[in-house]
């Protein structure tokens, strides 16, 4: 019983460390609780700051679920205790004691906890999220579908009915946190994930512009991840200084020609004056 209480406290306190708020404060981004969807989670940080900050928050949130579950396994806790430790980490993420109980929706923390609890279950849940997000481009729909299937994946792969209640409670909490997303999905007002490629490609690949800037620091680099009109505008902007140089050279040559022609026009006037004398 003492081990159970200890692990529940550790899981909840680790889950209460909200990485979205910390990352936004560290890098000078808007407060995710006040901007965007007003949810301090990875998806909102992705919209507010970009892909690199969204992935950073996603990794930290997953670690909040991974570390307490690994600790529970190292202490030889029973599977039910490990599952409740995962539940405590998710509750801490949703209702953090360090941030006035205003937290995220617990999707990344749940996936991290499942990866540590049973790796195959975690992979299946993560794969479900990626597939749904890739085809429909709704992060909320992907979260709802993947987390809802987690308890049933555990029944198929583990077959232990004792771990079903805590995993089912996680599902209920995640669905409750997505209640506003349900209404927006029904009304067709839910914002989509805005990527130019598929979600999987965007997560796996780095931006071409950043790699080019690292190879050629201090030089102008045309971004390859933009449309054709922006490319032509950037190309014209790069060529403009050369045109200016050419025009200045032309002005210099014309001024030289004018100065050379002026003495020739004055010589005949002096000759006519001498002839009159």
UniProtKB/Swiss-Prot annotation:
Region annotation (Disordered) ranges: 207-277
Pfam family, one: G3P_acyltransf
Localization (cell): Cell inner membrane
Keyword presence, Transmembrane: yes
Main localization (coarse): membrane
SMART domains: G3P_acyltransf
InterPro entries hit by this protein: G3P_acylTferase_PlsY
Statement: the UniProt record of this protein carries the keyword Membrane: yes
Catalytic activity: an acyl phosphate + sn-glycerol 3-phosphate = a 1-acyl-sn-glycero-3-phosphate + phosphate
Residues passing through the membrane, by range: 3-23, 55-75, 79-99, 111-131, 155-175
GO cellular component labels: plasma membrane
HAMAP family reported for this sequence: PlsY
Family of the protein in this entry: Belongs to the PlsY family.
Protein name per the record: Glycerol-3-phosphate acyltransferase
